[in-house]
Design a protein with these regions (language model features):
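Hydrophobic alpha-helical connector segments
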Residues: 57, 71-103
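C-terminal peripheral helix-coil segments that are non-catalytic and often amphipathic
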Residues: 106, 136-144, 157-205
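Amphipathic alpha-helical packing segments from all-alpha helical-bundle domains
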Residues: 91, 99-103, 121-147, 158-165
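Helix-turn-helix
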Residues: 11, 15, 19-53, 57
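N-terminal intrinsically disordered/low-complexity leader segments
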Residues: 1-4
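Short, hydrophobic secondary-structure boundary micro-motifs
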Residues: 112-114
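Solvent-exposed, amphipathic alpha-helical segments
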Residues: 15-22, 65, 69-76, 110, ...
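Alpha-helical DNA-contacting segments of helix-turn-helix folds
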Residues: 56-65, 126
Length: 205
């Protein structure tokens, strides 16, 4: 019984993944998912209360992992003594982005759902929310540098948002455009070098 139950659940999730990837959450048909899974509507509702509950079951583990590791990286850095933060800046950022690239490459399809197919769900602003966190911690770090006597030019929150948004969306292109895993780390490493040089220029370094 348990084996049959697990098989039914897997069939529903596999059919849903294909349907959501093809049509997005809003365009996906619950009837088509049930049909493609080869189960009854009653069997479906034995596992999920709605189409959104099904989408959440597929996406949430990955959204949670990406956001929690991202927040951990931000708070770990911010909790360092201020005088130690500058020397850790590049290392912390590179390590986290390298982990993120590996993770999204290992979980391409559900991550692609999260990034490309979530309109109409609570996940549709996922990248925007990450960007807002990045902006907040960037502005805090600028404050740290100023307190240390660095002459950091004033930069608007909107500019910081544009820069951070460009960076995150560029990293996620790895999944959106099915970049080969062998190529992704190198491309993202060069992307980081590009953004690091830009930030250095803006900060007068």
């Amino acid at each position: 019984m348990e084996e049959n139950s697990a098989t039914t659940l897997e069939k529903i999730q596999e059919a849903a993944l294909a349907e959501f990837l093809k049509k997005g959450f809003l365009g996906a048909s619950l009837r088509q998912i049930v049909k493609n899974a080869g189960v009854t509507t009653g069997a479906f509702y034995g596992y999920f209360s709605s189409k959104e509950a099904l989408f959440t079951a597929i996406v949430e583990p990955h959204a949670s992992m990406l956001m929690s590791r991202f927040m951990e990286a931000q708070t770990t850095f911010a909790d360092l003594p201020e005088e130690e933060q500058p020397k850790h800046m590049g290392v912390e950022s590179r390590d986290h982005v390298a982990w993120m690239v590996g993770y999204i490459c290992q979980h391409r399809e559900p991550v692609k759902l999260l990034l490309c197919c979530a309109e109409g769900t609570s996940y549709e602003h996922f990248v925007h929310n990450m960007v807002e966190v990045e902006v907040e911690y960037t502005l805090r770090y600028m404050g740290v540098l100023r307190r240390m006597g660095r002459d950091i030019p004033q930069m608007s929150r909107s500019l910081c948002h544009i820069i951070a948004s460009g960076m995150f969306n560029a990293i996620f292109e790895v999944v959106i455009h099915d970049m080969p895993y062998e190529q992704a780390p190198r491309d993202v490493e060069q992307l980081q070098a590009f953004y690091t040089a830009g930030w250095s220029k803006l900060m007068g370094e």
